[in-house]
Amino acid sequence: MIKVTRSSSPREVYTTSMLLSQYIRHQIASGESSIWIAQRNGRTKDGYDISEQGVLKMLQISGSGDFYTDMCQLDMLPTAISYEFEPCDGLKAKEIFVSRRHPYTKKDGEDLTSIITGIASWKGRIKVCFTEPILPEEIASCTSLSKNERFVELGKVIDRQIHKAYCLWPNNYIAEEILAEREGRDPLVVRKCSRPAHQTFLIHMEDRIDQAVKALKAEGEFKPVDGANSSEADLRYELEDIFLHIYANPIKASLTAV
């Protein structure tokens, strides 16, 4: 595991980013090994993965300065990892719930807890899909844009590959179906799922929400947004809504990638 420094002084962040970029470029260009890089600072919280421009910029800073040459040299291969059960779903719902009320501050050891939970928790079925490599012509299509827009567009190219490669499990369709009913609309996609699959997902959601409510109460965070008059049932409903979007958003992402 490679640690990426994000919260130090600008000079230290640049120095460590340059070292990391040089290492990655050397390993790939020399053929010694491939490097796996997460798109964001941890897996996305709401189930909608978007590539991080900062990571793409970090990858180029060790190059020659020519966008096309530098990015082609990295031989990028987008990869989609789809879990039947998101291992940190309850923790993510809890974090989003709190962040709606005030800026979220991580507690000591929270990252380690998330890593251990992500490794050890039940995930059900898992599919890892390696997409087609990013083609030179796709990189070339970004070169006429401004410096910042190049990375935005390249990120979109990567995202389309990943979103198209998502494996959508019954849980995704069930969550979308429940959300559509709650919001009074038609589901984005209709997929017949078995009654046992529905029951399993609902039991899983109830268990995770129970854990989140217990933790939020212990931390004094199970409370309405400032100025709102919300009952405990309303707050639980909000947590469920957040949880359901974590599972339903990959459907939206896959549809927009077509």
How would you name each of these model-derived features?
Residues 15-35, 42-258:
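Membrane-interfacial terminal anchoring regions of lipid-handling membrane enzymes
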Residues 1-19:
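Membrane-interfacial amphipathic helices and adjacent loop/beta segments
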Residues 6, 40-41:
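Glycine- and acidic
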